[in-house]
C-alpha cells in the first residue's frame, strides 16, 4: 500500500510505502475503551471537608418534647442533610478510584486501529471533516513542513493540500460553552480539525490554527487520533513521521 507525498505547493513529490500499521482492522470498540480510559485516568480526585455543615453550636433537644431529635439552633434544624446548611448526604470521596483499566495490548491495538482509520476517506468524511475530493488519504507531506515557523506559511500549505476548509469549519464552529466551565478557563468549545503528526520536534507553524493539534509520531495517542471516541480524524503526516509510526 503506497501513498503520494506532496510538497509544500501541493504537487506530487513521489510515493512512499505505508507501514503495515495502516492495514490494521477497524476496532471502534477498543478505540472507545482506550479513549474513555485515558480520560478517566486524568480525573483529579475530588473530596469535601469532613466538617462541612457541622460547624454549628446546634444541639439535639432530646426526648420527651414531642419533636424530632435533630440538632437545632434557635429552633431551626441544623447539621442533618435535609436541613438548610446541613452536611452533604453522600459527598464525593477523595479515596474513590475513578480510573478505568485497559489491557496494554488492547490499548496498543486501539492506537494502531485509529492510525489506520486516518487513511479511510469515507470514515474521515463521516466524522465531519471537510477536504477536497482530489485529496488522497492518508495525507503525506514532505519533511520541509516541519521547518515552517510562521502560521501563515502553514495556512498556505494546507490550502495547497486542499484541507484548509476544515480549519475554517472549526473556526466557524467555535461557541461559548454551556455550564460552569465558562468561569473556569474553558469558556469556548471548538471542533477538532487537522491533526499534524511530525517526527521529532513539534511544528510551530500549525499549532495555533483553529481546532488543530500537533503531535510527534512516537507520542501521538488514541485521543489525538479519535477525539470523542470517534476515529477517522483528518491527519497530515510528514514523511519522517510515517517511518517512525511504523514501530507503533
From Swiss-Prot:
It holds the Pfam family Ribosomal_L4. GO terms for biological process: translation. The keyword Repeat does not apply. This is Large ribosomal subunit protein uL4. It comes from the Archaea. It comes from Natronomonas pharaonis (strain ATCC 35678 / DSM 2160 / CIP 103997 / JCM 8858 / NBRC 14720 / NCIMB 2260 / Gabara) (Halobacterium pharaonis). Part of the 50S ribosomal subunit. One of its GO terms (molecular function) is rRNA binding. The keyword Cell membrane does not apply. Residues 92-109 have a biased composition (Basic and acidic residues). NCBIfam families: rpl4p_arch. Residues 44-109 are annotated as: Disordered. Belongs to the universal ribosomal protein uL4 family. InterPro entries: Ribosomal_uL4 (IPR002136), Ribosomal_uL4_dom_sf (IPR023574), Ribosomal_uL4_euk/arc_CS (IPR013000), Ribosomal_uL4_euk/arch (IPR045240), Ribosomall_uL4-arc (IPR019970). Keywords: Ribonucleoprotein, Ribosomal protein, RNA-binding, rRNA-binding. GO terms for cellular component: ribonucleoprotein complex; ribosome.
